Amino acid sequence: MNIGLINPAWGDRRRGVNSTSLYRCIPPQALLQLASLTPLSHEVDIVDENWSEIDFTRPYDMVGITGTTVQIPRAYAVADEFRKRGVPVVIGGPHVSFLPREALGHADSVVRWEADEIWTRVLDDVRTNRLKKVYNPKFPKSLDFTVHRPVSLVFRVETPSWLPLEIKAATIQIQRGCPHNCEFCSVTTFNGRRVKHKSIGYVTDEVKRAKAEGARFFLFLDDNIAADKEYAKELFEALIPLHIRWLSQTEINIADDDIIYLAVGASENCL
């Protein structure tokens, strides 16, 4: 099949350094993950509408769309346009995971929560005309997925025109879930309270591959990189000899543990 994976535009798609430019320039991690899990018998085209136009005339056999709440009006408009052309649309992401009935007004199928382990099944169901209205996969026990096609993790960071500098960065998600249940946050509901993570070797292999592609800076897309403190200590110790600069999110009580010194050490020895 010919598959189109689409990340809808954030708002007005104006390019330039503004409050949303960082979010817009980060590659759509969910789509990169699904592309890497797609068997080689299929063709995959990733379109990030923040940087390129969607070609609605392309002969896709199916379209997959992701989107947060701020993107969802555009996601639904894109889905409606493809369905007018007879293309099956599967939609996923945080917003539709919480509101699948709303999403079914614009898509043929909704994949809730984390799609990794059932993605190939969804593709088979599209191919055999057995697509379900809603898929409710279980949370994966491990994030060490077998990839069918390596997808580049590296992207160019947008910089002001007056700054003659090109920064190559890479995005890697190391773990999902958070043991807390903060009232303002959807992570626990979406990814669960049990922290799932990649093996240390899996992470360091991804870092080495991205460095070989020219990455000089890393964004670890975890919601709480120190959620599992023992794992975090092992992770930072493994990152120290790789000499990288990195950015991530964590909870403030990281300062109460010697883990913060390992985190600093994992970056201060960068070249």
Regions found by a protein language model. Give the residues of each.
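Acidic, low-complexity intrinsically disordered segments
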Residues: M1-E213
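Conserved SAM/AdoMet-binding glycine-rich loop
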Residues: I3-I6, I200-L271
